[in-house]
Amino acid sequence: MKLIIICGATATGKSETAIALAKHLGAEIISADSMQLYKGMDIGTAKLSVDQRDGVAHHLLDVLEVHEDANVAWYQERARKLISEIHSRSKDVVVVGGTGLYIKAILDDLNFPDTDPEVRKSLNALAEKIGGDAMFERLEKLDPGAALAIDKANLRRVIRALEVIEITGKPFTANLPRKDSTHFPDAQQFGLVMDRETLDQRISNRVDEMWQKGLVQETHTLLSSGLREGRTAQLALGYAQVIKFADGLISEADAQEDTKRATRQYARRQETWFSRDERIRWISPTQPRLETIISHLRNSQSTRAALHE
């Protein structure tokens, strides 16, 4: 049975491509989006509605409350179990998302040390003293590669990366495997790309649409459900900016524009992260996406069959 990854920056059309491919293959979809895990975070994460999923089974959507936290190990365990279960029913799996570390956790064996309470306490105290931006700058200097994989606004993950560096004496990314997947060696990855101008415009349009659909009201509803209690969910793009607006720190117009700016920056980091993985086959905007992926899958299947003759 197949395991296919559809990855790329935000707003490149990954979800639509994944659904078209899953319908063609009769496959099921697993989300690799760290914020679509949360119930109620629909508008701000561009989560597809049930109707938009077009009858295709989706997994790892709406599985956590906003006050709960997830990590890479948590995601890895659940995603791998789901893949095995779906394959046991003789169905292919399409993984789709832009959280690069989650995708890597599915495919590869990541070896991170357990949390050290004293190191964590020290880093938390330092963060309170110098602030999140300074902590991220510290990470950029110690491990630029890790800074690409982690959202600058997600202080919890920034601190975790710094903790791994301090415990191991090695860069956070040194714990990531460099060779081909040891867990799913036959997995195939396809990356979607767009030119910068087009992608920036799509991001701007998407944020405007989120505001029109009611992102501000959705955020207020989530705040009443404990959004501030979750260390991860409250930092999600869009929601973090609306929280600042709700607290009177910025205007609504500034919140909207800052969401666009932060999303563009996040897209750049996603592009750089995925570009480092030589296993990804890139599909340009001029190529018909579904047909190109299907052609690659057929060619790969023929090659494997020939090798086993």
Task: Label the predicted regions.
Residues 1-309:
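Phosphate/pyrophosphate-binding catalytic cores of soluble transferases and nucleic-acid-acting enzymes
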